């Protein structure tokens, strides 16, 4: 995914908002947590460009591992449920890490993701984007999958505009 992580986070927040309306988290904090979580795994791009000099695919870094986010999500969610839905920090961690899992799932659509790292060193991807154009990002923008990203953005925009009316 190239441009749809933040809009996908917004869609996720809209879908979950009614379910968690009774919690003591403000709507602003609720949306902020999920939308930050939806883009957070890509902070490894700073390391990728500034220190690693693009020598290792940034999806190999631990912030793009299911094995990193899934235990955080499950432990926080179990604690939230065990607290009879009152542990606000557990809910916040669940929302953030759940959105990070969404990010990784979206990346798997057309980008290599090492789903089982660090245990298995193999990338997985649903659809390959072949390298035909320079610069490299044109390969993604001119691929049919970019339409899916635009669709996600459009759905998020419709939900946002619909909220204001």
Describe the predicted segments one by one.
Residues 1-165:
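N-terminal membrane-targeting hydrophobic helices
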């Amino acid at each position: 995914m190239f441009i749809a992580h933040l809009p996908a986070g917004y869609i996720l927040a809209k879908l979950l908002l009614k379910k968690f309306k009774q919690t003591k988290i403000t709507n602003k904090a609720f949306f902020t947590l999920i939308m930050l979580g939806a883009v957070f795994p890509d902070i490894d791009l700073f390391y990728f460009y500034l220190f690693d000099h693009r020598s290792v695919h940034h999806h190999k870094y631990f912030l793009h591992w299911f094995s990193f986010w899934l235990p955080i999500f499950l432990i926080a969610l179990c604690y939230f449920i065990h607290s009879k839905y009152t542990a606000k920090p557990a809910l916040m961690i669940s929302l953030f890490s759940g959105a990070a899992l969404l990010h990784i799932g979206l990346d798997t659509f057309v980008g290599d993701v090492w789903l089982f790292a660090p245990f298995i060193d193999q990338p997985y991807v649903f659809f390959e984007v072949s390298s035909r154009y320079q610069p490299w990002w044109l390969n993604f923008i001119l691929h049919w999958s970019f339409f899916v990203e635009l669709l996600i953005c459009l759905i998020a925009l419709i939900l946002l505009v619909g909220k204001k009316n």
